[in-house]
A protein has these predicted regions:
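C-terminal and inter-domain tail/linker signature
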Residues: 1-138
Length: 138
């Protein structure tokens, strides 16, 4: 399957997927999400957060990856964070050059949003990325 092709076949839940866009970020890419306060800017910061998030996810299984519209790409997956169930939808907007320009990551349910924000806040405590996550009490 090519990176941009879609897959929603329920018998093909993928655990070996690597996001093509992670190695194709625009220099000025932005990232947002329900667990993120504000907007993360720049390829280095966005890549770091995505790679670290992938380490936090347990049992990540992709239900769908594929294009939407002319410049969009979607991912839908389930995972666990510290044993808690989590569903995630990622939208990627490509720029004219085909690079990932803007990401939006939405976790659900709300308890998972807050848990993810706290876990990432603990990870980034004392770093410039801490301001995007919950660090109170860390």
């Amino acid at each position: 399957m090519k990176p941009q092709e879609g897959s929603s076949n329920p018998t093909r839940k993928r655990t070996d997927y690597y996001p093509w866009w992670l190695d194709n970020l625009a220099d000025d890419v932005t990232g947002e999400g329900a667990a993120i306060q504000g907007t993360i800017q720049g390829a280095e910061a966005v890549r770091r957060v995505v790679l670290d998030a992938r380490k936090v996810y347990e049992n990540q299984q992709f239900q769908f990856t594929g294009n939407y519209g002319d410049n969009g790409f979607l991912e839908e997956y389930t995972c666990q964070i510290q044993g808690q169930p989590n569903r995630v939808v990622v939208t990627v907007h490509r720029n004219a050059a085909g690079k990932a320009q803007h990401l939006v990551v939405n976790h659900r349910p709300r308890s998972s949003v807050l848990l993810f924000a706290r876990v990432m806040g603990e990870k980034y405590a004392g770093t410039p990325l801490a301001k995007y996550f919950i660090t109170t009490g860390c």
